[in-house]
């Protein structure tokens, strides 16, 4: 075993890492919530998805990402891959992880502890934020970013769509 430390860069995993920072480990974790914007089709009936084009799928409402990740986001595949990654990265059984839709992409992950408290990591949907944290870890470095306007901030959450749960079931099976 080495003293090597893995510092995640992906926004959700970096958020979990930050929420766990200062804790003695994961033994007091009750659950971890990983958020998903849901992509451009989250409110579209599943039967309508057979008519979407690649161009439609590449129009992510919040994030600027490469084509593959944007398509994976539109299909919710990326969230399932993130579930698998989080399970192994944080060495917790998949049952600890919940996936929820958060269309605004402001809350990146939530760690809830056994005492009922929750720590949320939030920032504008900008990959420079988790990358800067990963590069500096202990000493935060200044970057240009869009401030959150808390007086006009609306946060909403919804359950992972049941008509799209098959992909999540597969991801959970892979974790076991």
Where are each of the predicted segments found?
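Catalytic, metal-anchored helix/loop core of enzyme active sites in primary metabolism
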Residues: 1-176
């Amino acid at each position: 075993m080495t003293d090597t430390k893995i510092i995640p860069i992906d926004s959700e995993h970096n958020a979990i890492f930050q929420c766990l920072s200062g804790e003695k480990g994961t033994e007091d974790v009750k659950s971890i919530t990983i958020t998903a914007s849901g992509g451009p089709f989250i409110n579209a009936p599943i039967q309508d998805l057979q008519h979407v084009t690649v161009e439609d799928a590449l129009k992510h409402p919040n994030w600027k990402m490469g084509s593959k990740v944007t398509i994976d986001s539109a299909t919710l595949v990326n969230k399932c891959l993130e579930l698998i990654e989080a399970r192994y990265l944080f060495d917790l059984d998949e049952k600890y992880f919940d996936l929820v839709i958060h269309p605004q992409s402001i809350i990146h992950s939530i760690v809830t502890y056994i005492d009922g408290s929750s720590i949320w990591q939030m920032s504008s949907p900008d990959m420079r934020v988790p990358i800067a944290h990963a590069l500096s870890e202990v000493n935060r470095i200044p970057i240009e970013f869009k401030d959150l306007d808390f007086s006009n901030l609306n946060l909403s959450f919804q359950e992972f769509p049941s008509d799209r749960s098959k992909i999540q079931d597969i991801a959970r099976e892979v974790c076991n």
